[in-house]
Design a protein with these regions (language model features):
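Cell wall/extracellular polymer interaction/catalysis modules
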Residues: 1-50, 70
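Exported/periplasmic cell-wall-interacting domains
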Residues: 2-3, 39-45, 52-127
């Protein structure tokens, strides 16, 4: 059964994404990797603006094609939630800041989140 996500909260201090349903019950807690100290994930309230089954991520020092299950939460698409299979393949655990500002997560969680989170879902990124 498809279970729609009602809200998302990313906690930068414990590197976790908590998923809530419409009754504000915790549906899932996902380990994530947010921005490193040199490229921090901003603290803000937003919503899911766009969703891409696969997209290319660009930065000043990188281009990563085929990033799966991406959901952008900033209007300019600079901050997104997405799978990071390269991190998994390298054996680097989630729960540690490693990104350029996005919220990375394991592929299985990103797939589930992508399929259960509608555009417009509110998200809070907090310290």
């Amino acid at each position: 059964m498809l279970e729609l996500v009602a809200s998302l909260v990313v906690d930068l201090s414990d590197q976790r994404l908590t998923v809530y349903n419409s009754d504000q019950e915790v549906v899932r807690v996902i380990p994530v990797s947010t921005g490193k100290a040199s490229t921090p994930t901003p603290i803000f309230n937003s919503k899911v603006y766009t969703k891409y089954r696969s997209t290319t991520m660009y930065g000043r020092t990188y281009t990563v094609p085929g990033v799966p299950f991406t959901m952008c939460v900033s209007a300019n698409e600079s901050i997104c939630l997405h799978a990071a299979p390269w991190q998994e393949n390298a054996g680097k655990p989630f729960g540690v800041p490693r990104s350029h500002g996005c919220v990375r997560m394991p592929l299985k969680h990103a797939r589930w989140l992508f399929h259960n989170t509608p555009k417009g879902t509110p998200i809070t990124i907090q310290a």
